[in-house]
Structures are given as C-alpha cells and as structure tokens.
Amino acid sequence: MRPGTSICRTGFPFANIATDFDEGSKSFRIRNGVLPLPFFPNDGIHTRNVLKQNKSKEGNYDMLYVETSTPGLKGQSGGPIFDTNGHIYAMQVQTNHIPLGFHPISEYDGKSIVENQFLNVGIGVHGKLLQQIMRDHHISFKVEGDSSEEEQYIINE
C-alpha cells in the first residue's frame, strides 16, 4: 500500500456492550437488548508507514505500523483497515495526536485561552507484521496481490 491509497476502517465505536461472564461455560455472553450493534465505518487515506525503533515485548518483531489521515474511534480498535477492494492492510490500534505547531488564542468569558492545534491520525499494525505473527503461530491466511511494491517507511523513535 502506498501513501494516498483510499482506506476505510470499521468497528462499533458508539456501542455500550453489556456482557456477563458465565462461570459454567467460562465465556462471556452479550446481554439481551444489546444487539444489533451500530456498525460505523470511517474513511481516509494511507498517509505513511511508521517503523518504530523498538521491537515487540518478546523482541522478535519489528514494530511496523500504517498511519491513516483519519483517527480511529474508541470501539474500532482491533478492527480492519482496508482498501476499496476489501483487502485488509492493517489492524486499528490507536490514534495519535500530532502537534501542528501553532497556538491561536481565543477569548472565552473574558479570559484568554490558548488553543493547541493537533492533527489526529489513525495507527494500525501493518499487514506485513500481522502476517509474520500469524505464520509464527501457525494461523492460516490468504494473501492477494503483489506485495513486492517498494514501500517507504518513516523511522519513529
């Protein structure tokens, strides 16, 4: 995936999912009246790839992420980030707030208030890292398309 690729992320950000734990079956059950959940997609573009300087906790994976032009919403974490063909490129994990470097001052109720300006971007675990983890845990999956495209990475500490 290259910067500028149209993407979409899905999830259930506005849901209050009430569950109970069933000791007998050792499983969670969704309470009556919760379903159907409100499904919510939001679109954007792939802005860049980010390779963190540090490795995973176990030390065996380079931490590679996809950054998107739109933030993920609470409730979309763990959901897919995919292109217009439905190919999954990443898994949403967090939203970053990048300072824009200017701070306009506004007046409110007779007081001056500094407004820090940020760009909110979504962060997802890159599909290459997901594939590596699934291979290591013997989880089968299918890859479509040409993954030999040269990709650019931003090195981030």
What are these regions (language model features)?
Residues 34-54, 70-78, 115-135:
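A short, hydrophobic secondary-structure junction motif
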